[in-house]
């Protein structure tokens, strides 16, 4: 079986180093547990902008602006609270498209979803591993 490389730090610009306890503090406050894959992604891309601004899933094109800042635990929780009408308890917002859309990760199903706050629609995209591969691929 081929190993999917996620050693792609060069695909992220303006990354803010993640504070030592940022993720564990957030997990504790939200009473959740992040997967190692999600933690690794946030560590290498925290508040970063993707060099790849657009990507395709099926016939749909998506814009990716940046990963949210996981160092600002209280602000992130407040922001998630402002989106609570669209979020399930097992979903966490982790990035945006710069146009009112947000990328969510469902921790139960391991699926990344796109939330369009203009019309309230939520669309399942890919499992986390495939989403990161698509987002961080250079090809």
Labelled PLM ranges:
Residues 1-101:
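A surface-exposed partner-binding patch
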Residues 106-109:
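Short acidic-glycine loop/turn motifs at beta-strand connectors
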Residues 121-139:
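Compact, glycine/acidic-enriched structural inserts
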Residues 102-104, 123-124:
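Short helix/loop capping segments that flank catalytic or ligand/cofactor-binding pockets
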